[in-house]
């Protein structure tokens, strides 16, 4: 598979590195307005290929995106310490207006994978600018939040996060919804499993985990300015599912009508991801509080997206 990455900063380059380590792409082309940066990142990653999967990686131009099956959009201005993701909207929407036509001029059949924040609204903007079907314009969404949730649950219970099945829904941001009622360890509800292992999840533990998931990005940004390793790994995971037509269930952002009372909104619910992009969504069986929270998240995103005129 050939993958293009527009934006060779830390997120884009970490995604490229993670794909090389996973061996999910045969070709990766990095594009950045700072050509010197793109060349440096490509060379640095290339020098690691002898220790990983053989991958052709280089810095190029939009013309080099020809035949790319996936193009990752990681270009945009970064999130400042303490800045809400939604505040990034107007600045990054302008960036996409310039980038996407250039991408599609050379890769009209590609799947666009958006990671620029605020990712849910930016995914919707990318869909509107591109005119592509919604299954071919997907965002990283709450994939990273879901990984954080699983990691913290696994740590608390004392099992591998790979054995934890839990999802974060809605916005990748402040209104996200931790789907506690649907969380399992193996095939056992997380609360029941935690009790069996004498590691109960009481109100205090639940609040601690909830807060840690929600505030993780802000704490990382406060310490080093941005997040990149986790999201880079998540992007590689999405590309892997597309490359292998895996039909993996991943919490990605795409256009959906699963929220009652809101015909269509771009947010995260678990979706089947394969060669065609975003497949059918899993309609979550939520408790009353979770339903209200997801509805509120959808309303926030809908209002933000509708406020942007393309």
Regions found by a protein language model. Give the residues of each.
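Rossmann-like NAD(P)-binding element
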Residues: 50-111
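N-terminal Rossmann-fold NAD(P) dinucleotide-binding loop
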Residues: 12-13
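Rossmann-like NAD(P)(H) cofactor-binding subdomain of soluble oxidoreductases
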Residues: 85-150
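Aromatic pocket-lining residues of Rossmann-like dinucleotide-binding sites
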Residues: 19
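C-terminal substrate-binding/catalytic lobe of Rossmann-fold NAD(P)-dependent dehydrogenases
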Residues: 130-136, 146-310
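Conserved N-terminal Rossmann-fold NAD(P) cofactor-binding segment
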Residues: 27, 31-69, 83, 302-310
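Glycine-rich Rossmann-fold phosphate-binding loop(s) that bind the pyrophosphate
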Residues: 8-9
